[in-house]
């Protein structure tokens, strides 16, 4: 077996060991444990300015019982773990009312999104979403968003950015982890002065 097929076949059995910083350099992807860079909110940076490892930490935001009840009523997701204290307490995983996972993700977005127009053009999805620790009323959420992979599109004025999102509670436990996928302008757009 020759060519790229042979190389890929061989690589399936190859392990690369290195520090997180070295792995990030080799793969052009941020990996947990690699350095993060803060400063300017990364959603304010164009693709040309953005670097793997650019990061923002936002929060805390306290989750209230009213938040959970409103989300259940508004979305129609009235699963008993979010609405019935007695039944939720009997569940061995929860021990009482817990927040919806999608409420946690929505609150995290509310913490890290920069609302003004800028180089981030669109959020086009989430991948690898996992809910790791139940969130109860009174828990405080903080989110760290880190540029994980930057992929310019050859045929467009924007590229794709994959962000590592880690939502933690007041004890530093990860409650949700996922990748946020965005489309980001290659260059800062100038405001339209004709208005």
Residue ranges and their predicted role:
Residues 67-70, 104, 146, 164:
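General structural feature for long, well-ordered alpha-helical segments within catalytic domains
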Residues 6, 13, 70-73, 110:
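Charged/polar, solvent-exposed surface patches and flexible loops
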Residues 30-99, 186:
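Catalytic strand-loop segment that frames the active site of acyl-thioester-processing enzymes
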Residues 2, 62-65, 102, 106:
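Alpha-helix N-cap/helix-start motif at coil-to-helix transitions, marked by capping-box chemistry
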Residues 2-52, 135-140, 144-195:
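HotDog/MaoC-like acyl-thioester-processing domains
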Residues 91-99, 103-149:
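Hydrophobic beta-strand-centered segment that forms part of the acyl-chain substrate-binding groove
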């Amino acid at each position: 077996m020759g060519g790229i097929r042979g190389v890929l076949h061989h690589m399936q059995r190859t392990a690369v060991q290195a520090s997180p910083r070295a792995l990030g350099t080799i793969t052009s992807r941020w990996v947990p444990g690699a350095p993060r860079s803060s400063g300017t909110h990364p959603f304010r940076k164009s693709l040309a300015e953005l670097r793997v490892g650019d990061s923002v930490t936002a929060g805390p935001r306290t989750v209230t019982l009213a938040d959970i009840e409103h989300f259940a009523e508004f979305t129609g997701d009235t699963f008993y773990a979010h609405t019935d204290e007695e039944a939720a307490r009997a569940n061995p995983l929860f021990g009482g009312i817990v927040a919806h996972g999608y409420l946690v993700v929505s609150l995290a977005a509310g913490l890290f999104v920069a609302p003004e127009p800028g180089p981030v053009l669109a959020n086009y999805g989430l991948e690898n979403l996992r809910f790791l620790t139940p969130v109860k009323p009174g828990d405080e959420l903080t989110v760290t968003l880190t540029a994980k992979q930057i992929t310019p599109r050859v045929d467009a004025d924007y590229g794709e950015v994959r962000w590592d999102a880690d939502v933690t509670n007041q004890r530093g436990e990860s409650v949700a982890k996922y990748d946020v996928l965005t489309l980001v302008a290659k260059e800062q757009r100038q405001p339209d002065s004709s208005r």
